[in-house]
Structure formats: structure tokens, C-alpha cells
Amino acid sequence: LLWGLGHASAQGVDEPMRRQAAALFRDALSAFRPELAGPMESSYALQGLHAYVRAFPGESGPRERLRTAANRLAARLPAGSDWVWPGDRVTYDSGRLPLALLLAAEAVGDDRYREAALRTLRFLERANFPEAKGPLRLIGNSGWWERGRDPAAHDQQPIDASGLVEAYAAAWRATRDPRWLGRAESATA
């Protein structure tokens, strides 16, 4: 909900729509509890918060909620581990998590979020690009990617490709590292 309303607040087709979306966003934000949200719910909410904060930079409340949600999400990522994911299973739309942290880093200028996002994106590369210069291979939903196992190879979700393209493009914007631009291009092929 916050994702859609945040974007509608910033990019709605006309001013009345943007005002209505902003009012609905503020109402929905009052019910958002980062401490109760799962990692993917927080990732989606952070995308909406980012859009809203960019459209309304003078409002401190949404910016602080963004920071709180990003802190909690980044804290869920294991440090010093090969498995850089907040749980034992990677499922669909996994690129949204590093994307959300990259957007949070952009919104509030906190490099900790950027570094956490890049670690997570490198982790996801192991499943999505198992061959260094090979094509994108999405994690299948017929088993997903469980810790200690190979990623499932069948029943991939198209939503995964869009999230990864956005995450790789955001990583390139944040770092100007051509690696990420190359991954974004490969993921669209």
C-alpha cells in the first residue's frame, strides 16, 4: 500500500490525484509498524517512503520512518556470513530488498544501507548469475532457494526480473560500477 501511494503522491497524473494519494499515504503510514513488518513488506514500504520523501522533502516524519524501517531491515542481514539474507529461504521478488536499501541510502545519505544492499545484491548474484558471464537465471518457486541447497531451477516468477533490473540499475546509480549496469542489461535480455 505504501509503495503505491508513495509513488502516486510523487508521480500522479495531476495535482488532485497527488494530493489525495499523499493524504492516503500519511494515513497508511500511521499504521505502518516496521518492528512488525517482515523483510519483504519493509522492502515494499521503503520504496513508497523513498518516493514520498523525494516529493515532500520538508516532511520529517516520513523520513524518520524510512530511517527506522531501513535500520531494522539492514539489521536483519547476517554479518560475516555467506548467507546474506534475513531468513533461511529466498523466495520471489528478492531484488526488492537490496533495491529498498539503496533507495533508503539515497534518501537519507546513509552509506550503511548502501553497503548492506550491495552485499545482498552480490549474494543474490550467486543464484541469478551462476555463470560469471552467463544469462540471468531466476530462482524458481518450485523449492525456492533454501540455505545450504541449490536454488530451484523451475517455475521462475517474471516479477523477479523486474525487481533485479531495478536493483542493478540503482546499484549502478549509487556506485557507477559498470558491473551493475552490465547485470541490469543482462537481466533484460
Stretches found by the model and what they are:
Residues 2-189:
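Glycan-recognition and catalytic cores of secretory/periplasmic carbohydrate-active enzymes
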